[in-house]
Regions:
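Hydrophobic anchor at the beta1->P-loop junction of P-loop NTPases
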Residues: 16
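Short, Lys/Arg-enriched N-terminal segments with co-localized hydrophobic residues
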Residues: 1-8
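A glycine- and Lys/Arg-enriched "phosphate-lid" helix/loop adjacent to the NTP-binding pocket
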Residues: 99-172
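Conserved lysine of the Walker
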Residues: 24
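The conserved Walker
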Residues: 20
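Pre-Walker A (Motif I) flank of P-loop NTPase domains
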Residues: 10-13
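Conserved nucleotide-sensing/catalytic segment adjacent to the nucleotide-binding pocket
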Residues: 53-99
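Conserved substrate/cofactor phosphate-moiety recognition/catalytic segment
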Residues: 29-72, 171
Length: 176
């Protein structure tokens, strides 16, 4: 499931995309280790742990800009693919979830990854102090908005699903 993103091209970046608690932060380090390339961690999580989760739109723009800066720095080093634990597209979806609108900065942003891995919500939601959308309907809406953002942007993406090693196998089946 998904569009584009087949083999044959050198990918500069692979982005882990999707709502809260689907295993992105578990897969990210493992995928970076598999390729021997950098991992850009979830900038929004670091921001939330430092500043709290009572976000204004300006906070989300700051998160997106911070993540974009770290990504550009990693890409400039030339070790590919850089693994991104989310990016500004995901922060745009957060804006949609929290406020029902987004700052124009998000739609103007042009730094999309070469491949997006959309993580299914087939794992249990786990509270960690920064997560907000644990109810089934909220998780489904978050997933649907995440998928819609990828489709709206027309970027290559693939669905990642499965429990335990099956999830890793799903990732490896797409990324090699």
């Amino acid at each position: 499931v998904g569009r584009g993103g087949g083999g044959g091209m050198t990918r500069r970046s692979i982005c882990l995309h999707g709502p809260e608690s689907p295993g992105k932060s578990t897969i990210g380090p493992r995928l970076a280790a598999r390729f021997g390339t950098p991992l850009i961690g979830e900038y929004g999580r670091d921001y939330a742990e430092m500043h709290g989760t009572d976000f204004a739109m300006a906070d989300l723009v700051s998160i997106a800009k911070g993540h974009d800066m770290l990504t550009r720095e990693a890409l400039a080093r030339g070790r590919y693919p850089v693994i991104l634990d989310t990016d500004p597209l995901m922060t745009a979806v957060w804006a949609d979830m929290l406020f029902g609108w987004r700052d124009p900065w998000f739609d103007a942003w042009q730094g999309c990854a070469d491949l997006y891995l959309l993580f299914d919500i087939d794992l249990p939601w786990v509270e960690d102090g920064t997560r907000m959308f644990g109810r089934t309907a909220e998780r489904q809406r978050f997933f649907d908005l995440s998928r819609a953002e990828l489709e709206r942007r027309g970027v290559p993406w693939r669905l990642v699903s499965g429990v335990g090693e099956a999830r890793w196998d799903s990732v490896m089946g797409v990324t090699g």
